[in-house]
């Protein structure tokens, strides 16, 4: 598995990032995997600015482009891509986060990229929404919000037809 500095999806798609040729070890199968972190689009997913709460068409287009580039550079060449960290912070916009989660996971799957949700256990957005990626209450063994977690799961199973 290969990743770039800070696992930036932008850098792995640049000309400065390359993957070693692993064909000498097994000429019939590529075994390389690229891992990226994708909190995209930044203004919606990670920027704590509470005015950027709606998952709109411009943000959808940005995600489409990011996944398309990952597909074209890696997946189309037989190199797997896993988004090893993804999520969007809590700006009291659960319905929009659900829309984002479904779209992110489904678009990633359409382009051949798997996704792993980031949960840092931080829930408190009363002072700032910064880094509020909490989903699982470790001390209680419960998920919150259930609707968001279910959106991730449903999107990972949905038919892509």
Question: Positions of the model-derived regions?
Answer:
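Aromatic-rich peripheral "rim/lid" segments of glycoside hydrolase catalytic domains that contact
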Residues: 93-161
